[in-house]
């Protein structure tokens, strides 16, 4: 099962057709296929459930998709060495310097020769669509990776009106107040890790394994620094880092949560996958609701 390690959350601003038949048809147009001998990369949808044919996994109003990106890896020094050899050989043979366009043509030929022997780097990115709350969660640590996946989904569906989930109260201000005033929300526990920044972004302090109620940390907050990253524990169910842009990083579900479905036999892979997906989405939905409550709700967009 794809236990999310990060969560970049987006708000769907319009309702879309998520029916299984329509979704499968749309995703099939951009299904992932392995790179051919002349392909540098491939990007498309793969099956979330091992051995299944569907390019989506659905339980109730929850949908799981998996974007698969394959890239051929050709070390630049290998290309340079082979290219230099070819350039030297041709320049000596013709007793002249090659033009820029000729060198580029040689480079393209070198790459095409090396491609069939190149290793592949594979990357899978899970997407969870909550059609009940109209939120999309992407397991990505960078906005670039998330935007690439959203672009693939938009291409597949024809339209995808989304915006990043924004809180009414700035997370940096709220996190700072939680620590400075010792007023943590009831369901959250601050862990001993944070990042502090000055308003001008010139000074950054990163602390780890250090009590956040120490005089040193509180002094920085009194002098105007804000907490931009804060490690938190949510009701002993999972830990994560809340960022000032509202994204959740380094999600780690507690063992007692991940083991809840251990009574299901390992041989029954599909049933365990189903149960774990329901469990994970339920936990993250509840966490999102709690964060919205304590960060003033969702920001109103004009």
UniProtKB/Swiss-Prot annotation:
Its main location: cytoplasm. GO terms for cellular component: bacterial nucleoid; cytoplasm. One of its GO terms (biological process) is DNA recombination. It is found in: Cytoplasm, Nucleoid. One of its GO terms (molecular function) is double-stranded DNA binding. InterPro entries: RdgC (IPR007476). Keywords: Cytoplasm, DNA recombination. It holds the Pfam family RdgC. Belongs to the RdgC family. May be involved in recombination. This is Recombination-associated protein RdgC.
């Amino acid at each position: 099962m794809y236990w999310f390690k990060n969560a970049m959350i987006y708000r769907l601003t319009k309702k879309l057709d998520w029916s299984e038949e329509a979704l499968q048809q749309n995703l099939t147009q951009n299904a992932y296929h392995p790179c051919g001998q002349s392909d540098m990369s491939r990007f498309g949808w793969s099956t979330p459930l091992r051995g299944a044919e569907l390019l989506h996994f659905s339980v109730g109003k929850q949908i799981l998709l998996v974007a698969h990106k394959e890239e051929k890896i050709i070390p630049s020094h290998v290309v340079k060495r082979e290219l230099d050899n070819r350039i030297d050989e041709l320049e000596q043979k013709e007793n002249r310097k090659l033009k820029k366009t000729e060198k580029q043509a040689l480079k393209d030929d070198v790459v095409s020769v090396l491609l069939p022997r190149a290793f592949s780097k594979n990357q899978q990115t899970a997407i969870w669509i909550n059609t009940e709350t109209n939120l999309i969660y992407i397991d990505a640590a960078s906005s670039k990776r998330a935007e690439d996946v959203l672009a693939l989904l938009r291409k597949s569906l024809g339209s995808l009106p989304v915006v990043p989930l924004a809180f009414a109260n700035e997370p940096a201000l709220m996190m700072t107040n939680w620590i400075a005033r010792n007023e943590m929300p009831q369901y959250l526990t601050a862990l001993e890790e944070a990042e502090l920044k000055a308003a001008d972004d010139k000074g950054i302090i990163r602390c780890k394994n250090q009590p956040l109620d120490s005089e040193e940390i509180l002094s920085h907050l009194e002098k105007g620094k804000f907490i931009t990253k804060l490690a938190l524990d949510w009701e002993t169910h999972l830990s994560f880092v809340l960022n000032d842009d509202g994204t959740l990083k380094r999600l780690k579900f507690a063992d007692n949560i991940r083991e809840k479905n251990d009574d299901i036999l390992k041989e029954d892979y599909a049933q365990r996958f189903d149960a774990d997906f329901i469990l994970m989405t339920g936990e993250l939905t509840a966490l999102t609701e709690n964060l919205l409550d304590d960060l003033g709700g969702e920001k109103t967009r004009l």
